[in-house]
Amino acid sequence: MESGSVANDSGPLNSTPDVHLYGKTAAMKQRRSNTMLFVFRLLTFSFSLAAVLVMGTNKQKIRSAPQYLEVAWHDFDPFRYVFAVNAIICVYSFVETWLAVYTLSRGTLLLPETFQVWFDYGHDQGFACLLFSANSVGIAMAQLLQSGSTLIQGQYYCSDAGAYCTQARVSIAMGFGAFLFLALSSFLTGLRVARWYLP
């Protein structure tokens, strides 16, 4: 009886991988999660880089000025804030994208699991809030300029500055796109943290 019991313990039933929800193995689910995180990281990087480039090149000539006069993105503090935060997110998401590629290619995390999971989750949360704050301030400034409540150089409207206001709003829209994918990344890293505390 004992030998039969041992034979059953080493039989096909115990060699079958542990199957979880929807019949996916734990390894398959983990790889799918890593792939999704890589896509979200890459999109966050792409949108934040686009926001930086569009805002950083936003310089227009004021056509109705009696002499040559330009308005640039750094003439308004909210637009500086948008540029700076998107630049930070761009660098952060580039590093995280590289880490995601490493995880996908090697099948393991570069850093100790506990440290990297909490590092990713904490920074995703903090940077997502920072990015939302910057874009909210930026869009408020863009609306004030568009409505004429705030004037460029104290006397010129958006229509006098070519595509200045439009380009600023495009940059902010790209920033909100980066926020969306950073928030989705934060959701996935949050699930990784939560799994440690779920029964």
From Swiss-Prot:
Any one GO cellular component localisation term in the record: plasma membrane
UniProt keyword annotations, A-Z: Cell membrane, Membrane, Transmembrane, Transmembrane helix
Pfam families: CASP_dom
Membrane-spanning ranges: 36-56, 81-101, 125-145, 170-190
Major localisation: membrane
Compartments where located: Cell membrane
Extracellular topological segments: 57-80, 146-169
Cytoplasmic side: 1-35, 102-124, 191-199
Membrane topology (UniProt): Multi-pass membrane protein
InterPro entries cross-referenced by the UniProt entry: CASP/CASPL (IPR006459), CASP_dom (IPR006702)
Family: Belongs to the Casparian strip membrane proteins (CASP) family.
Quaternary structure (record): Homodimer and heterodimers.
Protein name, entry field: CASP-like protein 4C1
Organism: Physcomitrium patens (Spreading-leaved earth moss)
